[in-house]
């Protein structure tokens, strides 16, 4: 089967007890990814966490100014190298506090989800984010337009409250859904268990309900079933191979959410997103080969970068061509 793939990355800091710094969490790992993709003619799609830029724009601190400049130049470099930048929103930035040393305090997650915001606040975020990223991209490509969105924390539901935000800003593609996955905690919830198990589909008012005449398109993150056998193989491989360490200086760890017992998590067979940094290349290759999808949409984060990501990019590019969300939009 002829396959294509989408390399998608959420460009953001950590949202745990240590946010990490811009240099170690974004700039350095992203540059490694960009160089690797260029070496194999791969094209990436970077979902840019706009509110991070907005918060830095408000600070007069020299470190913050320097970090902002680095990020803006890197985003323009993405476009210059032929990659795409698209809109990503993590609304809990409105409650974040700057620590003065390049890191952030996220102890308040009240507004973690888009549905926690008033309508006018959501509309403003979409509008300002689209304008900001478009302006950055057009310093490189005068005709650039944003066409896709990914919700922070995948909280794209209920879509009916976001529909006008999409329409008003020319966004036609969403890529937040992961078939079979759900979450419900005090800050966020989503339920994709009954979403169409398809590579791409149209929808209108609900991202989990296909509508052939819908004006929006869902490009779901591809998942595969990660059972106890695959987990065991991964563990054995990790035991006898050089450990691939994350180079970033932040952490996902949070103290405000319960941690699922390790044994229960280990025994559970679960749908798992196609990713790269946290996967072993051997397991990634098996999952890619076993997938019955002709389009594989991969999600990763520069902040999670390990050398595994570089190996898997090179491996996957031997098996399939890479495309962008804009390529999909042009064929609608």
Task: Specify the residue positions occupied by each region the protein language model found.
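Soluble or luminal CAZymes and related metallo-dependent hydrolases
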Residues: 25-29, 66-70, 117-129, 158, ...
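Active-site and substrate-binding clefts of carbohydrate-active enzymes
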Residues: 212-224, 261-263, 286-332
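Active-site-adjacent pocket scaffolds in enzyme catalytic domains
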Residues: 148-289
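Generic structural signal for well-ordered alpha-helices
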Residues: 30-34, 71-75, 126-134, 163, ...
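Active-site beta->alpha N-cap acidic-glycine motif
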Residues: 2-84, 147-150, 298, 303-306, ...
């Amino acid at each position: 089967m002829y396959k294509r793939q989408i390399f998608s990355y959420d460009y953001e800091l950590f949202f745990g007890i240590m946010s990490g710094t811009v240099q170690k969490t974004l700039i350095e790992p992203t540059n490694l990814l960009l160089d690797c993709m260029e070496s194999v003619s791969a094209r990436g799609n970077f979902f840019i966490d706009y509110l991070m830029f907005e918060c830095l724009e408000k600070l007069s601190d020299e470190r913050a100014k320097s970090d902002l400049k680095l990020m803006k130049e890197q985003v323009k470099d993405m476009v210059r190298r032929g990659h795409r930048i698209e809109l990503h929103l993590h609304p809990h930035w409105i409650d974040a506090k700057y620590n003065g040393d390049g890191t952030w305090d996220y102890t308040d997650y009240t507004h973690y989800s888009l549905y926690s915001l008033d309508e006018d606040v959501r509309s403003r975020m979409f509008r300002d984010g689209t304008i900001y990223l478009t302006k950055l991209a057009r310093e490189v490509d005068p005709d650039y337009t944003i066409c896709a969105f990914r919700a922070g924390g995948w909280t794209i539901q209920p879509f009916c409250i976001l529909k006008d935000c999409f329409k008003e800003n020319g966004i036609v593609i969403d890529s937040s859904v992961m078939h079979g996955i759900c979450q419900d905690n005090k800050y966020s919830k989503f339920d994709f268990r009954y979403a169409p198990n398809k590579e791409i589909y149209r929808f209108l008012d609900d991202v989990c309900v296909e509508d052939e005449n819908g004006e929006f398109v869902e490009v779901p993150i591809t998942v595969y079933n990660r059972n106890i056998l695959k987990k065991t193989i991964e563990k054995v491989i990790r035991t006898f191979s050089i450990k691939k360490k994350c180079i970033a200086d932040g952490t996902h760890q949070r103290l405000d959410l319960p941690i699922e017992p390790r044994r229960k998590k280990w025994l559970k067979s679960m749908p798992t997103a196609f990713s790269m940094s946290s996967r072993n290349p051997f397991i990634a290759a098996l999952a890619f080969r076993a997938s019955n999808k002709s389009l594989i949409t991969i999600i990763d984060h520069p902040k999670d970068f390990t050398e595994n990501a570089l190996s898997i990019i090179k491996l996957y590019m031997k098996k399939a061509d890479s495309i962008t969300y804009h390529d999909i939009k042009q064929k609608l």
